[in-house]
Amino acid sequence: MTMPFGYASPEQQVRDKSEYARKGIARGRSVVVITYADGILFVAENPSATLHKISEIYDRIAFAAVGKYNEFENLRTAGIRLMDSRGYMYDRRDVTSRALANAYAQTLGAIFTESVKPYEVEIVVAEVGPTTDDDQIYKLTFDGSIADERGFVAIGGASDQVTTSLKEHHRDGQPLADALRVAVQALTVSVPPGLPQNGERVLTAANLEVGMLDRTRARRQFKRIAGPALAELLAQTATSS
């Protein structure tokens, strides 16, 4: 049977979409999500003060993303609305990161399957629990695949390099300053597109976005760390390294 001009098999279409999405994500600077003694720390290389990669979703739940900003921002706002409505209709304790991750997986999977263009995003959804063992971290990719991560996860174009560094230096139950040092050190190893591949980079408070889910806080447990507070914490990491 003669195939029509421009025909591509389903397998080829999936490969093309995957390659397209990966190329878009590879242009994004990495994000690290890492556990520490009192919660979960989010660290992103992000020179923008207004376009956030890290965000609170609901009480104990936060979100991090890389890729195309308008696409992951749509997912972020949809996630907030979904969790707010769930908490209003049922109980705040029924709002979980697992439910949010499943909703994102269904949305991303449907877009990847049904649309010509997939979303160019990688996402992390995390929830802080009463103890470290109860913390939950989920990584979602452009095709709706979902993975349950323990301890740490990296997303973005240089995630393999970043993950290698995290595996070497992360320790369970580490204090906040140590977790930040490990995360920043891992991000420093990665080299964003357009920058030279040699020479050690220095990441400062001006080009980092940092947030945390702190289990010691009441109710709303997400907190941003910025400005002088971040600079002071980075100084502590320098003296303890």
From Swiss-Prot:
Any one biological process term the GO annotation gives: proteasomal protein catabolic process
Pfam families in alphabetical order: Proteasome (PF00227)
Localization in the cell: Cytoplasm
Gene Ontology molecular function, alphabetical: threonine-type endopeptidase activity
Pathway involvement of the protein, from the record: Protein degradation; proteasomal Pup-dependent pathway
Any one Gene Ontology cellular component term annotated for this protein: proteasome core complex, alpha-subunit complex
Entry keywords, A to Z: Cytoplasm, Proteasome
Predominant cellular place of this UniProt entry's protein: cytoplasm
Entry-linked InterPro entries: Ntn_hydrolases_N, Proteasome_alpha, Proteasome_alpha-type, Proteasome_asu_bac, Proteasome_sua/b
Regulation: The formation of the proteasomal ATPase ARC-20S proteasome complex, likely via the docking of the C-termini of ARC into the intersubunit pockets in the alpha-rings, may trigger opening of the gate for substrate entry. Interconversion between the open-gate and close-gate conformations leads to a dynamic regulation of the 20S proteasome proteolysis activity.
Family note: Belongs to the peptidase T1A family.
Subunit (UniProt): The 20S proteasome core is composed of 14 alpha and 14 beta subunits that assemble into four stacked heptameric rings, resulting in a barrel-shaped structure. The two inner rings, each composed of seven catalytic beta subunits, are sandwiched by two outer rings, each composed of seven alpha subunits. The catalytic chamber with the active sites is on the inside of the barrel. Has a gated structure, the ends of the cylinder being occluded by the N-termini of the alpha-subunits. Is capped by the proteasome-associated ATPase, ARC.
Free-text function comment from the UniProt entry: Component of the proteasome core, a large protease complex with broad specificity involved in protein degradation.
PANTHER family: PROTEASOME SUBUNIT ALPHA/BETA
The protein, known as: Proteasome subunit alpha
Taxonomic placement: Bacteria, Bacillati, Actinomycetota, Actinomycetes, Frankiales
